[in-house]
Curated annotation (Swiss-Prot):
This is Protein DMP3. It is found in: Endoplasmic reticulum membrane. Coiled coil: none annotated. Its main location: endoplasmic reticulum.
Amino acid sequence: MSSPSSLTQRNPTSSQEQSESVPQLRRQTSQHAVMSQTLTSAANLANLLPTGTLLAFTLLIPVFTSNGSCDYPTQVLTIVLLTLLSISCFLSSFTDSVKAEDGNVYYGFATRKGMWVFDYPDPDGLGLPNLSKYRIRIIDWIHAVLSVLVFGAVALRDKNAVSCFYPAPEQETKKVLDIVPMGVGVICGMLFLVFPARRHGIGYPVTGDGGRR
């Protein structure tokens, strides 16, 4: 039977190990939380894309790729589809919406001097607010490029699109296809947080003008 003195000698060591394990456990928990938040942000990247473009991609990519089993003609058609959808993401960053005096919301395309409202019934623009504040800015070009990169990341995470061009990828290629879209998506998501979008164009939710520059 162990003597009381031996027990007192063991207890400090045990308590020291416990005290050292607590910070380590906290660090692991913090790392898991950061990783979980990063993956969640990457999974929500699709919310940064125009709804119509994302819907078209979701519906058409299985058809164009034959569910991932592509031959040369379907590969060409898939490239054309992805190119058109990328252009759609790029141009959608320059669209915006405006609320007229009649209470209706109208859409237009930003220009260097203001905005061209293409669905407003009055060609003179009577009843519209001052459109000069809707002109193109440098941030719009940044958002346009980021939108294309985000779409590319989403496309590379789609199994049909990847299988179309890489039906049997090597181990190194597979790692690149797993890492690059995630990295691009996370970086673009962070940049969208730093440079938030203030336009509410086609395919994006419409809000008030309170955040307008």
